[in-house]
Amino acid sequence: MEGLIEAIKSNDLVAARKLFAEAMAARTIDLIKEEKIAIARNFLIEGEEPEDEDEDEDDEDSDDKDDKKDEDSDEDEDDE
């Protein structure tokens, strides 16, 4: 890192670019590895079934709507 700073101070842009690329290469490789791991975690393991948490919530909501419709229709019958 000190070499990069010295190259910048001395206006040696070619050396600064090379030193910067070397410093960033290691960090870039680490970030790529981390991203590959994160992506791999998103894929299902063979034979594993996805969780249906969202579908269960939707089913409960639709049941509530059906119950509400039934109550509304009962109230309409009482009015007659």
Swiss-Prot record:
The keyword Coiled coil does not apply. Keywords: Viral release from host cell. Residues 43-80 are annotated as: Disordered. Residues 46-64 have a biased composition (Acidic residues). The keyword RNA-binding does not apply. It comes from the Viruses. The production of one phage particle requires 250 copies of PIP. During head maturation, PIP is cleaved to form the stable head constituent, internal peptide II. This is Prehead core component PIP. It comes from Enterobacteria phage T4. The lineage of its organism: Viruses, Duplodnaviria, Heunggongvirae, Uroviricota, Caudoviricetes. The gene is 67.
